[in-house]
Amino acid sequence: MRTRIRRGVAVALTVSALTFTAACGGSSDKGGDKADKGKAAEQPAEKPAAAPLTAEQMKAGILEAKDLPAGWKAESAPSTDDQAKAEKPECQPLAQLMSDKIDGATMGGNQEFASADGASLLAQQIFTMPGTGAADFVKSVETAAAACATFTMVQDGQPVPVKAAALPTVKSGESSTGVRLTMEIPELKMKIESDVLIAQQGSGVMRLAYVPMNGEGHKAFDDLAKRGGDKFVKAAQG
């Protein structure tokens, strides 16, 4: 079975200013009353939609081996059109974390890495979504993690039972969430645990997933997530 992991970069939203208008009344020659003509009501300008991330921005947000602790090396990250499907619709955002394509997204750069001993894997992917899609995607993952403690995913035609749990980790970008996905493979007597950070900046999303060789390896995730998140946000902000 193949395990896929991806991450994403993002663009900064522009902050808009409030406009304010006031008019002052004059006084009469005889010292009459001063009239206040009133103020125009303050109205916040609509926040403009974030521009899509460019291919250059998405590429710039991808980690390189030199950005990681010693021993990590880059590996090829072949992309396909495979899309994992959850049997329960409310769990689909979690299944999408293990897909090569994200519905409604323009996919950008991606890179995978292996630890020095080849036992731990790290993968990052960046993509951009129109409108509020990026922020909505992060929220949908957070909601699904709370609603889908267990679910069944179909990947490569095979049903795979998955456990999901919210994962406290570093914050990144304008919004982010962490989730741990656990897949049991009885035939291989194997359990795969993947720690995932989903971060949003403007119209961009980063997926950073880490599969450690054992339970002790999970403690390295926060550092790896911060490295990936920092680079993605910097690239997204241009």
Regions inferred by a protein language model and the residue ranges of each:
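Mobile, glycine-rich extracellular loop/lid and propeptide segments
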Residues: 192-200
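Proline-anchored loop/turn motifs at beta-strand termini and strand-loop-strand connectors
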Residues: 63-71
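Short, solvent-exposed coil/turn segments at beta-strand boundaries
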Residues: 172-174, 199-205
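A small/polar (G/S/T-enriched), proline-flanked helix-loop surface module common
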Residues: 72-190, 218, 224-225, 236-237
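Bacterial Sec-dependent N-terminal signal peptides
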Residues: 1-9
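Short, well-ordered beta-strand elements
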Residues: 122-125, 203-212
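A short acidic/glycine-rich loop-to-helix N-cap element
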Residues: 208-224
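N-terminal low-complexity, Pro/Thr-rich disordered segments
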Residues: 8-12, 18-60, 75, 85-97, ...
